């Protein structure tokens, strides 16, 4: 057969693959390989077999070829076949010997020399070495060697910043602390035209920077244009669903749950099967107590994705929201059974125990989550909260400090450190932690942070810094006028100052919120007696 005729059949194979006609592709690729015995045609046949899900046959074909030992493409495809067959040890053997350190630097196993993965700056294909590093990471992850998996994922993204999947695994499996994520991102060598990608990656990692910094990142990406003009409008990333899902996640971290919910709801109208956005939407609905939305989302997810952990996690969220914690726990457990690396279900499982004050089971679940997700500070933080609930304040403080080491920019960590210091009567330390909490809040203060402001006021009152205490109580009232603690604290501070008329006024406001509050009732009587003994304030008009 002439070369032109063979080339024509190669074209047929490529066309069959593009049209997903894999049996046809296998048929014609087999004939081309038989006619030429050329390595490229053998590789094309193996590709067709792989796409047609004939993994054993594809592996046998590649392994029988001597070139598999010399050509990285052959070795990588053979390893991909073993990945699909779940033969992870054999997959690692096929990929060859290499060592990696914690910085993601790869060394030759024989001579110990550093392997350089630099690629041509003009090359827009993913570096094959990066893909091999990523596959090694997946294999180690499947073998439960998360430390090696983390190192190989780092090696993959360092070998080629275009290998997004490696970064995705590092982020979603919480393998890195917030500082490690930032350090990794700053070490990546982006080409000049990939500046937008660097900005996008910076939006994907943990976002605890100040609002102005994060908003600037989003604004920069939203203004990124394609360089082409359609009609009179520029094409930008402003309405990209991935970018908007990142922004929704940021709103959730800032405790702006209503804003987050509205954005994710709009996104899911546009793209109802965007699963990352769906997860953020579920989290926002949980915080808002929107059980109807959780029910509808859970029903749709179970119908569309019955084999995904997210679907059963959504069912668990619904039951958790309506306070049926045993049922919630059952579905969180089902989600972790489907995907053991799905961190929200692991944490939700622990929370379902904590909600019923079953501390031992809750801490056991949190410890498992902390071991599996070393870059996520929430399990460690929740262990501290459980210890604090049982008045084991020193142990609680230790775990809060561990959480701070993992994520030093989350204001919630500093708030809990302040609370435990307050309980240990270390009021000066409590003031410092609460002030750090307010300093780390990325956006303007909202009602969610009102308890922190009140706690700071309480700590100042304990130090008898009444002026500062009153200032923060009044600041808390600008955030919420429904807090008994704020009114009673303000009343008591005025009472200590000898300002009985103001104290009486605020005790009344506190009792309006909770008429049977024993402390305010008793202190109101004391304040009235004190005012009688000191004479009626001339400024108070008697009716």
Swiss-Prot record:
InterPro entries: TPR-like_helical_dom_sf, TPR_rpt. One of its GO terms (biological process) is cell division. Disruption phenotype: Gametophytic lethal phenotype. Keywords: Cell cycle, Cell division, Mitosis, Nucleus, Repeat, TPR repeat, Ubl conjugation pathway. Pathway: Protein modification; protein ubiquitination. Widely expressed. Gene3D superfamilies: Tetratricopeptide repeat domain (1.25.40.10). One of its GO terms (cellular component) is nucleus. TPR repeats lie at residues 7-36, 39-64, 72-95, 128-159, 164-187, 194-232, 242-270, 277-304, 309-338, 343-371, 378-406, 411-443, 447-479, 484-513. Its main location: nucleus. It comes from the Eukaryota. Coiled coil: none annotated. Pfam families: ANAPC3 (PF12895), TPR_1 (PF00515), TPR_7 (PF13176), TPR_8 (PF13181). The keyword Flavoprotein does not apply. It is found in: Nucleus. Component of the anaphase promoting complex/cyclosome (APC/C), a cell cycle-regulated E3 ubiquitin-protein ligase complex that controls progression through mitosis and the G1 phase of the cell cycle. The APC/C complex controls several key steps in the cell cycle by mediating ubiquitination and subsequent degradation of target proteins such as cyclins. The APC/C complex is required for the female gametophyte development and is involved in several aspect of development by controlling cell division and cell elongation. Involved in the control of endoreduplication. Belongs to the APC6/CDC16 family. The APC/C is composed of at least 10 subunits. PANTHER family: CELL DIVISION CYCLE 16,23,27, CELL DIVISION CYCLE PROTEIN 16 HOMOLOG. This is Anaphase-promoting complex subunit 6. The lineage of its organism: Eukaryota, Viridiplantae, Streptophyta, Embryophyta, Tracheophyta.
